[in-house]
């Protein structure tokens, strides 16, 4: 069965020929009215425009017939091969698109991991810097506390010196003997450091007393 386009062209060709026939018939001359029959005179020649239209339709029809004949001569095997080739081409195209999408996703995921690693490193660095600052502040506060405590202890030791208290007097004031009787060593007391510090200061101020003590 001819394609729809072929039918349309054939109808157009038929319509053109028919119109040309009617136009030619109207120009026929009647040669002799007295004779029994009517003799038609030779029709005038076709114009260039008419010949061009007819030739164009004939050419188009010839091409369509040839194409149709070529298609009709294709074997089932050739059709199957062509179909498989088309399906293979479509499959390759789909696979290429999928591969491109996967590569794009992989690149995006890799960049995301890199960004997260950089961000984590920056956060860790910031935390370390903050911790170092806090430690430095704590150490500074501790040093300030120690300095204040040392100044306070010095004033206390000076008062003991002004009161002419000996290290033995300080030892008695802290009641280390009573602690020893209870089984508590004086060295475990928080006040023992004051005794030791004052003893050092006292004998540094009165070295002769230390010589007598050693003697």
Curated annotation (Swiss-Prot):
It is found in: Secreted; Host cell membrane. GO terms for cellular component: extracellular region; host cell plasma membrane; membrane. Residues 81-149 form a coiled coil. Induction: Expression is induced during host plant infection. The keyword Signal applies. Residues 1-19 form the signal peptide. A motif (RxLR-dEER) lies at residues 39-51. It comes from the Eukaryota. Keywords: Coiled coil, Host cell membrane, Host membrane, Membrane, Secreted, Signal, Virulence. The RxLR-dEER motif acts to carry the protein into the host cell cytoplasm through binding to cell surface phosphatidylinositol-3-phosphate. Effector that might be involved in host plant infection. Belongs to the RxLR effector family. This is RxLR effector protein PITG_00582. It comes from Phytophthora infestans (strain T30-4). The lineage of its organism: Eukaryota, Sar, Stramenopiles, Oomycota, Peronosporales.
């Amino acid at each position: 069965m001819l394609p729809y386009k072929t039918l349309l062209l054939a109808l157009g060709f038929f319509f053109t020929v028919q119109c040309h026939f009617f136009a030619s018939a109207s120009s026929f001359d009647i040669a002799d009215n007295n004779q029994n029959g009517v003799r038609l005179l030779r029709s005038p020649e076709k114009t260039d425009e008419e010949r061009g239209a007819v030739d164009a339709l004939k050419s188009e029809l010839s091409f369509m017939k040839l194409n149709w004949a070529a298609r009709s001569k294709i074997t089932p095997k050739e059709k199957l091969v062509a179909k498989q080739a088309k399906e293979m081409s479509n499959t390759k195209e789909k696979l290429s698109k999928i591969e491109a999408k996967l590569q794009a996703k992989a690149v995006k995921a890799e960049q995301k991991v890199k960004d997260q690693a950089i961000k984590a490193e920056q956060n860790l660095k910031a935390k370390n810097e903050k911790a170092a600052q806090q430690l430095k502040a704590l150490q500074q506060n501790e040093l300030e506390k120690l300095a204040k405590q040392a100044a306070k202890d010095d004033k206390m030791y000076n008062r003991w010196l002004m009161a002419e208290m000996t290290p033995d007097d300080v030892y008695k004031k802290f009641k280390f003997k009573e602690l020893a009787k209870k089984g508590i060593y004086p060295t475990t007391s928080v006040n023992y450091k004051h005794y030791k510090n004052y003893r050092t200061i006292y004998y540094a101020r009165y070295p002769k007393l230390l010589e007598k003590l050693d003697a």
